[in-house]
Protein backbone atom coordinates (compact mmCIF):
# COMPACT_ATOMS: atom_id res chain seq x y z
CA UNK A 1 0.00 0.00 0.00
CA UNK A 2 1.44 3.34 -1.06
CA UNK A 3 -0.48 6.39 0.10
CA UNK A 4 1.61 9.03 -1.64
CA UNK A 5 -0.74 11.67 -3.17
CA UNK A 6 -3.56 10.54 -0.87
CA UNK A 7 -5.44 12.26 1.91
CA UNK A 8 -5.51 10.99 5.47
CA UNK A 9 -8.83 12.05 6.94
CA UNK A 10 -9.00 12.04 10.73
CA UNK A 11 -11.77 9.87 12.12
CA UNK A 12 -14.11 11.65 14.55
CA UNK A 13 -12.70 9.71 17.52
CA UNK A 14 -9.16 11.04 16.90
CA UNK A 15 -8.77 13.67 19.62
CA UNK A 16 -5.09 14.62 19.36
CA UNK A 17 -5.23 18.45 19.35
CA UNK A 18 -3.08 18.77 16.23
CA UNK A 19 -4.71 16.01 14.20
CA UNK A 20 -8.34 16.34 15.38
CA UNK A 21 -10.54 16.83 12.30
CA UNK A 22 -7.47 17.16 10.11
CA UNK A 23 -6.81 16.32 6.50
CA UNK A 24 -3.21 15.37 5.79
CA UNK A 25 -1.85 15.34 2.25
CA UNK A 26 0.70 12.51 2.05
CA UNK A 27 3.80 13.70 0.19
CA UNK A 28 5.87 10.56 0.65
CA UNK A 29 5.10 7.02 1.77
CA UNK A 30 7.50 4.11 1.55
CA UNK A 31 8.84 1.20 3.61
CA UNK A 32 10.66 3.64 5.92
CA UNK A 33 7.58 5.68 6.89
CA UNK A 34 5.50 8.58 5.67
CA UNK A 35 5.56 12.38 5.51
CA UNK A 36 2.64 14.72 4.99
CA UNK A 37 1.26 18.23 5.34
CA UNK A 38 -1.93 19.11 7.23
CA UNK A 39 -4.00 21.14 4.77
CA UNK A 40 -6.84 22.42 6.96
CA UNK A 41 -5.31 23.91 10.12
CA UNK A 42 -4.66 27.60 9.47
CA UNK A 43 -2.16 29.36 11.70
CA UNK A 44 -3.82 32.20 13.56
CA UNK A 45 -3.18 35.64 12.05
CA UNK A 46 -0.62 34.47 9.50
CA UNK A 47 -1.12 34.85 5.77
CA UNK A 48 1.25 34.36 2.85
CA UNK A 49 1.91 38.11 2.69
CA UNK A 50 3.07 37.98 6.33
CA UNK A 51 5.60 35.26 5.53
CA UNK A 52 6.90 37.31 2.60
CA UNK A 53 7.24 40.39 4.82
CA UNK A 54 9.13 38.43 7.52
CA UNK A 55 11.54 37.13 4.88
CA UNK A 56 11.82 40.58 3.27
CA UNK A 57 10.53 39.29 -0.06
CA UNK A 58 8.78 41.87 -2.24
CA UNK A 59 7.00 40.40 -5.25
CA UNK A 60 8.38 42.10 -8.38
CA UNK A 61 6.57 42.93 -10.53
CA UNK A 62 3.53 42.58 -8.26
CA UNK A 63 0.37 41.26 -9.89
CA UNK A 64 -2.47 42.68 -7.80
CA UNK A 65 -4.87 40.06 -9.21
CA UNK A 66 -2.99 37.36 -7.25
CA UNK A 67 -4.14 37.18 -3.63
CA UNK A 68 -1.51 36.92 -0.93
CA UNK A 69 -3.98 37.01 1.96
CA UNK A 70 -4.43 33.24 1.98
CA UNK A 71 -3.87 31.57 5.35
CA UNK A 72 -0.66 29.71 6.09
CA UNK A 73 -1.31 26.19 7.42
CA UNK A 74 0.15 24.41 10.41
CA UNK A 75 1.59 21.58 8.32
CA UNK A 76 2.29 19.41 11.33
CA UNK A 77 4.02 19.24 14.70
CA UNK A 78 7.56 18.83 13.34
CA UNK A 79 9.88 21.64 12.16
CA UNK A 80 7.19 24.29 12.62
CA UNK A 81 9.70 26.99 11.68
CA UNK A 82 10.30 25.41 8.27
CA UNK A 83 8.21 26.24 5.21
CA UNK A 84 6.70 23.71 2.83
CA UNK A 85 4.95 24.90 -0.31
CA UNK A 86 2.56 22.52 -2.05
CA UNK A 87 1.85 23.69 -5.58
CA UNK A 88 0.95 22.69 -9.08
CA UNK A 89 3.76 22.34 -11.65
CA UNK A 90 6.18 23.58 -12.81
CA UNK A 91 8.86 22.27 -10.49
CA UNK A 92 11.66 24.52 -11.69
CA UNK A 93 12.62 25.56 -8.18
CA UNK A 94 15.84 24.63 -6.36
CA UNK A 95 14.32 22.20 -3.85
CA UNK A 96 11.27 20.68 -5.49
CA UNK A 97 10.02 17.11 -5.41
CA UNK A 98 7.24 16.02 -7.71
CA UNK A 99 4.63 14.11 -5.71
CA UNK A 100 2.27 13.40 -8.60
CA UNK A 101 1.72 14.62 -12.15
CA UNK A 102 -0.16 17.60 -10.71
CA UNK A 103 1.47 18.25 -7.34
CA UNK A 104 4.92 19.40 -6.26
CA UNK A 105 6.40 20.22 -2.85
CA UNK A 106 9.09 22.89 -2.65
CA UNK A 107 11.12 24.00 0.35
CA UNK A 108 13.40 26.60 -1.23
CA UNK A 109 13.07 30.39 -1.05
CA UNK A 110 12.88 30.78 -4.83
CA UNK A 111 9.26 29.59 -4.94
CA UNK A 112 8.33 32.23 -2.35
CA UNK A 113 9.95 34.89 -4.53
CA UNK A 114 7.45 34.10 -7.30
CA UNK A 115 4.36 34.48 -5.10
CA UNK A 116 2.29 37.47 -6.09
CA UNK A 117 3.83 37.60 -9.56
CA UNK A 118 2.91 36.09 -12.91
CA UNK A 119 5.68 33.52 -12.31
CA UNK A 120 4.00 31.82 -9.36
CA UNK A 121 2.46 28.35 -9.78
CA UNK A 122 -1.27 28.50 -10.48
CA UNK A 123 -2.22 26.81 -7.18
CA UNK A 124 -0.27 27.20 -3.94
CA UNK A 125 -0.63 26.08 -0.31
CA UNK A 126 1.96 27.35 2.18
CA UNK A 127 2.53 25.46 5.44
CA UNK A 128 4.90 25.67 8.36
CA UNK A 129 5.86 22.28 9.76
CA UNK A 130 5.05 18.74 8.68
CA UNK A 131 3.79 15.42 9.99
CA UNK A 132 5.83 12.23 9.92
CA UNK A 133 5.30 8.56 10.72
CA UNK A 134 8.01 6.01 11.40
CA UNK A 135 8.18 2.64 9.67
CA UNK A 136 4.89 0.82 10.24
CA UNK A 137 3.41 3.60 12.42
CA UNK A 138 0.93 4.94 9.86
CA UNK A 139 -0.12 1.42 8.89
CA UNK A 140 -0.85 0.69 12.57
CA UNK A 141 -2.86 3.91 12.92
CA UNK A 142 -4.91 2.83 9.89
CA UNK A 143 -5.53 -0.58 11.49
CA UNK A 144 -6.59 1.26 14.66
CA UNK A 145 -9.16 3.20 12.59
CA UNK A 146 -7.61 6.59 13.33
CA UNK A 147 -7.79 7.62 9.66
CA UNK A 148 -9.75 7.22 6.46
CA UNK A 149 -7.77 7.40 3.23
CA UNK A 150 -8.76 8.66 -0.18
CA UNK A 151 -6.88 9.62 -3.33
CA UNK A 152 -6.02 13.32 -3.18
CA UNK A 153 -8.31 15.76 -4.94
CA UNK A 154 -6.68 18.99 -6.16
CA UNK A 155 -9.89 20.98 -5.70
CA UNK A 156 -9.95 20.07 -2.01
CA UNK A 157 -6.21 20.63 -1.67
CA UNK A 158 -6.15 24.09 -3.23
CA UNK A 159 -9.66 25.50 -3.72
CA UNK A 160 -12.11 24.20 -1.12
CA UNK A 161 -12.55 26.63 1.80
CA UNK A 162 -10.34 25.53 4.69
CA UNK A 163 -13.23 24.97 7.11
CA UNK A 164 -14.88 22.56 4.65
CA UNK A 165 -11.86 20.41 3.72
CA UNK A 166 -12.34 17.73 6.40
CA UNK A 167 -15.95 17.08 5.45
CA UNK A 168 -15.32 17.34 1.69
CA UNK A 169 -12.34 14.96 1.88
CA UNK A 170 -14.47 12.40 3.72
CA UNK A 171 -17.08 12.67 0.96
CA UNK A 172 -14.41 11.27 -1.40
CA UNK A 173 -14.76 8.11 0.67
CA UNK A 174 -18.52 8.28 0.19
CA UNK A 175 -19.52 9.34 3.69
CA UNK A 176 -20.74 12.37 5.58
CA UNK A 177 -18.25 12.35 8.41
CA UNK A 178 -20.44 14.62 10.54
CA UNK A 179 -22.99 11.81 10.88
CA UNK A 180 -20.46 9.27 12.16
CA UNK A 181 -20.30 8.25 15.83
CA UNK A 182 -17.88 10.40 17.77
CA UNK A 183 -18.99 13.72 16.28
CA UNK A 184 -20.94 15.08 19.22
CA UNK A 185 -23.79 17.41 18.44
CA UNK A 186 -23.72 16.95 14.67
CA UNK A 187 -25.65 13.71 14.09
Swiss-Prot record:
InterPro entries in alphabetical order: AlgH-like
A GO term from the CC aspect: cytosol
Gene3D superfamilies recorded: VC0467-like, VC0467-like domains
PANTHER family, per the entry: UNCHARACTERIZED PROTEIN YQGE, UPF0301 PROTEIN YQGE
Similarity comment: Belongs to the UPF0301 (AlgH) family.
Annotated protein name in UniProt: UPF0301 protein YqgE
Species the sequence originates in: Salmonella paratyphi B (strain ATCC BAA-1250 / SPB7)
Encoding gene per record: yqgE
Amino acid sequence: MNLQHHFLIAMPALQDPIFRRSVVYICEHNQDGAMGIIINKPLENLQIEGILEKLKITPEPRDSAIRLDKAVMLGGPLAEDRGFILHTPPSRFASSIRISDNTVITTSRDVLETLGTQQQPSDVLVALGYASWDKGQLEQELLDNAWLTAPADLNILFKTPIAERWREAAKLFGIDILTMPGVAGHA
